[in-house]
Amino acid sequence: MPGRIGTIRDAGGRIGWPAPLFPRHAHGLLNVRDLDQALENVRRLPGQAATAFDLLPGAALGDTDIVVRHPADARRVRVLATADNAGLDATGRNQLGAIVAVDSPLHLYDQLVVTYNTDAARGNKTVGSQAKSAAWNMPIGYASVSVGISEWTSRQTLPATAGGAAALPLAQRTRRYEAALRVVPYRTSHGKTTLRFTLSRRDDRSRLGSTELDVNRRDIVGYDVGIAHREKLADGALDAGFGMRGSIPALSAHPGRVNDRPAWDGRYRLFTATLAADARFRVGARRFGYRGTLRVQHAPGAAPSTEFLQIGGRYTVRGFDGNQTLAGANGWIWRNELATGAFGANEIYAALDAGRVSGAGAAEGPGRGGRTLVGTSVGVRGGYRLVGYDVALGAPLYKPALLNTAAVALDVSLTARF
């Protein structure tokens, strides 16, 4: 006789209506994979990471009641303050930020995340950057929906030319609106496949002095579809993904321009693939962790520069300060990191990364002298109580002669939780 769900109820500390968490409801078949999905849905909320399910005999023969047991201290609002030097010299190297996450604001086990980031040189009117965003998501069994809006602005001053022209301020602004659906069509005790469907709008504007630069004007509606699979192993995990994104010219008010393509119709398409591996192992009594990630991008036709793959910096090829990068419509990034524990909950790590760009845009700027970067980095990260840190020193190992970067790149990131 198949088991069925009796009732679903909370054991105190309820933060919302639990129905959206569960793929099946009262009187539906009891399935372990459904319970795994529901538990993942609730634990994605920061304040519910310790939530557990109790399974109790139901009132009818074959029924099982599900009791949602929440943490004793489940704060619904979390704040994370950040400070780092991940910016650019041209728009503000040092950055300050805050992230506010609200659990179940609509009592649907949904989540609202609001972020704000700014350069630390608030009194400097010649350079600066700000970023802000708001995103909301909600689970619906094996699916989830999300919407978001973000804005990024920057200002810098272009140097005066040799002919005597005055320095001019350059201001840029990007806004993005997004709606997404994610579905889990396949799940086992050790693996999960996720499909994603995203519709977005991107609006770019820039001004040089008081003049709007029409060459940089874009208002593009686009799509992004993809599939990702995660497989848990005894001592690690494997992740693989494939995606396609592109534009919808019929809905785009201003598709922008592509160099050397005066008759471009605004349609572009890109393919991406990602493969990542996490592995834990021992050498004698010491534990190590390895993480490797390979990301590939290919554009079969013309694409705007906003879609180019950029390499050279802490989030792509480490060892470079990020002030100058290589960019191209096609390319790949391979990141490798080996870490081991040190003094308590902290760890030290070493990284070796490489990347290459090709296709449109790759031979412009520093790319005229080469299209490949190789860099390395060593660092330490960890935390104490509510404070976290990540400090690393990196250096370029191989680069084009025309790409200017510091001989040693210092990457610092600090966080504080409230």
PLM region descriptions:
Residues 1-87, 117-130, 292-295:
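Periplasmic polypeptide-binding modules associated with outer-membrane biogenesis and secretion
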Residues 55, 81-85, 112-118, 147-153, ...:
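Transmembrane beta-barrel strands of outer-membrane/channel proteins
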Residues 76-78, 106-112, 141-147, 188-193, ...:
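Repeated loop/turn-to-beta-strand initiation elements of outer-membrane beta-barrel proteins
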Residues 94-98, 130-134, 175-179, 221-225, ...:
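Hydrophobic, lipid-facing positions within transmembrane beta-strands of outer-membrane proteins
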Residues 100, 380-388, 405-418:
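Outer-membrane beta-barrel "beta-signal"
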Residues 111-113, 124-219, 223-227:
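Transmembrane beta-barrel wall of Gram-negative outer-membrane proteins
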Residues 205-362:
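C-terminal outer-membrane beta-barrel translocator/porin domains of Gram-negative envelope proteins
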